[in-house]
Amino acid sequence: MLFLNAKFIDLDLGENAVIVNEEDLKGTSYYPQDRVLIESHAGSVIGNIYSTKTMVNKGEVGMLVSELAEISISEGEEVKLRHAEKPESIPFIKKKMDGQVLNPHEIRTIIDEIVSKKLSNIELSAFVSSTYINGMNMDEISEMTKRIAETGDMIAWEKSLVVDIHSIGGVPGNKYALLSIPILAAAGITVPKTSSRAITSPAGTADVMEVLTNVELKEEEIKRIVKTTNGCLAWGGGVNLAPADDIIINVERPVSIDPQPQLLASVMAKKIATGIKYTVIDIPVGKGVKIKNEAEGAKLARKFIELGESLNIKVECVLTYGGQPLGRAIGPALEAREAIEALQDPKNAPKSLIEKALSLAGILLELGGAAQIGEGQNLAWEILESGKALEKFNQIITEQGGTPKKPEEIELGDYVEEILAPIDGYITDISNTAITNVVKEAGAPRDKKAGILLNSKIGNKVKQGDVLYTIYSGSEERLVSAINLARRVYPVKVEGMLIERISKF
């Protein structure tokens, strides 16, 4: 047992950690990465030991911001460190690593220990990897979904009909929600949209919306905003909705994986937590996204529908074209600009963005009773073209604490590079994977001003020297890295009409 004085450390490691001077560890049974219980007069918290020579003095224990807040410790206060018991879920994680089926108790224990931070990032990574490799059956996924939802707040609504649209993501520039949500809200449909930040893409809906307004809303704020406007566009992590999901996402993000069991549970847990009764799930299909073909998409759709039935949520899925970025803008600020431009002048907006936003909104207008079957997309267009969707979007921005902006008022990165066509020809491919990696290299989504603006799409004719796309970054170093990567992976490919000359010589 160790008695040390707490020292404030302004550091976020994504897990609970205690930093101890190596002199205090000598001659003890404590080693780096050991799990310990930190106790004070106000409570206790579990963390993993990290040793240091200089960060804290002998007799001190460095504690992170989240830990100090969790048990209300004052800096300099004496705390007690002792060995913590191994988490109950460790053998259950090993069981899943061996490809076995987990029972409800085992699944609930794993989720509970994720939320209570009893599992280290290494242990959590093992669980995520095991579900990525070995998968889960529907009973396991349903149990995990319910428990993830139960670990956080649950929002109840006065209205019985509450709807939502959700995309499984993977498509760069997937900003459709900034059009679809205000269209639905303008039609009188209750649509409290909560989104995650980017996992595998350069910008999630929450990242894009954060360029324009506050997305970290509490439950009562969401209720107030939705009561006033019929809709919102918020980050799910700010509301303590399904907190286990956000912890899992933080482990998935560095390796850009989104295991299908976690994907299903993540999406549907948020629907339970936000009181959704009807939801449309967008499943992009194509090269460089999560789902490669229509057969895979249909299989996933059936899983969503089956999971929804077990949770009493009506689910309708749509397979959408995901073979290239949606619209021309990729990256938070650029996507926010393009969304506002589309709301202001939909006739001149990218057709792919308009068509997707209208299609998804149209389905929910029909499910919500605002339009007859087959007429939803027409009503969605009327709302968009009339300016009512823009008006509603600006109202949502204002209610969430922002100020409506013109597209040109949204700042982009100061460091800019235009990438030119090397030859005359046609654009034959735009790689989602390469575009995503280049935009991330430029700094997105953390750097909101970073991104790529495409000048042309697949099938367009270009001449040598034409601008194919422009890279933006808030950092000169990041821009150089993005340019170097782009030169290696060729996000946009141009080919002439003559592919190859073949003769017998």
From Swiss-Prot:
Name of the protein this chain belongs to: AMP phosphorylase
- What keywords would UniProt list here? Glycosyltransferase, Transferase
Q: What is its EC number?
A: 2.4.2.57
According to its UniProt entry, what is the function of this protein?
Answer: Catalyzes the conversion of AMP and phosphate to adenine and ribose 1,5-bisphosphate (R15P). Exhibits phosphorylase activity toward CMP and UMP in addition to AMP. Functions in an archaeal AMP degradation pathway, together with R15P isomerase and RubisCO.
Signal peptide interval: none
Origin organism is Methanococcus maripaludis (strain C5 / ATCC BAA-1333)
Reactions listed under catalytic activity: AMP + phosphate = alpha-D-ribose 1,5-bisphosphate + adenine; CMP + phosphate = cytosine + alpha-D-ribose 1,5-bisphosphate; UMP + phosphate = alpha-D-ribose 1,5-bisphosphate + uracil
Q: Which residues does the Swiss-Prot or TrEMBL record annotate as the active site? A: 258
Q: Which GO terms describe its cellular component?
A: cytosol
- Molecular-function GO term, any one: AMP binding
Q: Which residues are noted in the entry as AMP-binding?
A: 170, 196-201, 205, 266, 290
Name the InterPro entries for this protein.
AMP_phosphorylase, Glycosyl_Trfase_fam3, Glycosyl_Trfase_fam3_N_dom, Glycosyl_Trfase_fam3_N_dom_sf, Nuc_phospho_transferase, PYNP-like_C_sf, PYNP_C, Pyrmidine_PPase_CS
Biological-process GO terms, alphabetical: AMP catabolic process; pyrimidine deoxyribonucleoside metabolic process; pyrimidine nucleobase metabolic process
Q: Does the keyword Glycosyltransferase apply?
A: yes
Q: Which family does it belong to?
A: Belongs to the thymidine/pyrimidine-nucleoside phosphorylase family. Type 2 subfamily.
Offer one Pfam family short name for this entry: PYNP_C
Query: Which HAMAP family does the entry link to?
Result: AMP_phosphorylase (MF_02132)
Task: Give me the segments passing through the membrane.
Answer: none
List, alphabetically, the PANTHER family matched.
THYMIDINE PHOSPHORYLASE
Q: Which SUPFAM superfamilies did the record assign?
A: Nucleoside phosphorylase/phosphoribosyltransferase catalytic domain (SSF52418), Nucleoside phosphorylase/phosphoribosyltransferase N-terminal domain (SSF47648), Pyrimidine nucleoside phosphorylase C-terminal domain (SSF54680)
Any keyword Transferase? yes
